[in-house]
A protein has these predicted regions:
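Class I SAM-dependent methyltransferase SAM/SAH-binding core
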Residues: 70, 76-123
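A short acidic, Gly/Pro-enriched loop at the edge of an enzyme's catalytic core
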Residues: 126-134
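Class I SAM-dependent methyltransferase Rossmann-like catalytic core
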Residues: 25-52
Length: 242
């Protein structure tokens, strides 16, 4: 409570909006990750176009000597639409669950050195010491802190020493929102009889502080919040090195 007036401090404005969204959608069934994106593949790029400035930002931050790139959760390659023109000889390995989005990516960039893998990137072997850089765009906010840290450790292993990792992702504005999202996802899993290990489409974002902590716990060096673009307080860009 406030010492000045005896009232509890006001909640963050985004918390009220988030609670209202949870209440409005509480009866919606969970969908598998692959099923969610395959069902919406036709409108995916139009929906994601709002992050055009973020794609360009990520592309500009890739080290100029990048020759081998890992794209985790590449989808239809919206970030690659900005990255590939900058790196004409770039070799890309993209991993995604959606066959339809991967097909769209290949259609957009014929003749480019793309190795596209339809797989769950939380389980797929990313290899060791393979890539100069790795990127992940708006994909890892469906993972718990423990799942994310484990994946980040594997991404780190896949990089060559000194390799760069760029992650642009949805973040929780407050710790309360992070906790609310996690609790609601668990409730819906129980309701729908879905095992904890099944990959479902429900946002469980971390706060920026926890995102940095996960990067550090995974062994990355120089983990930093690069920033947020004006007008978008919930999409942050992080950078780290192996």
């Amino acid at each position: 409570m406030s010492a000045a007036d005896g009232h509890a401090p006001a909640a963050h404005p985004e918390e009220a909006a988030y609670r209202a969204w949870l209440a409005a959608t509480r009866d919606e069934p969970l969908e598998s990750m692959a099923g969610f994106f395959d069902a919406r593949a036709g409108g995916y790029e139009a929906h994601m176009a709002r992050w055009a400035r973020h794609y360009a930002w990520m592309a500009a931050l890739l080290p100029p000597d990048t020759a081998e790139l890992l794209d985790v959760g590449c989808g239809s390659g919206l970030e690659l639409d900005y990255i590939l023109p900058r790196f004409p000889r770039l070799r890309v390995t993209g991993v995604d669950l959606s066959a339809q989005l991967l097909r769209r990516l290949r259609e957009k960039h014929p003749g480019r050195a793309l190795t596209l893998v339809q797989a769950d990137y939380t389980r797929f072997d990313l290899g060791r010491d393979r890539f100069d850089a790795a990127v992940a765009f708006e994909t890892m906010h469906h993972l718990t802190y423990a799942q994310k840290t484990a994946l980040l450790a594997r991404i780190r292993q896949s990089l060559r020493p000194g390799g760069c990792f760029l992650c642009c992702d949805y973040i929780a504005a407050t710790q309360a929102i992070e906790e609310l999202a996690l609790a609601e996802c668990a409730r819906r899993r129980r309701r729908d009889g879905i095992a904890d290990g099944a990959f479902v489409h429900f946002d469980i974002p971390l706060t920026a502080a926890h995102e940095l902590q996960a990067l550090q716990s995974a062994g990355f060096r120089d983990a930093a919040l690069v920033g947020l673009l004006d007008g978008d307080a919930n999409t942050a860009l992080f950078r780290a090195r192996r």
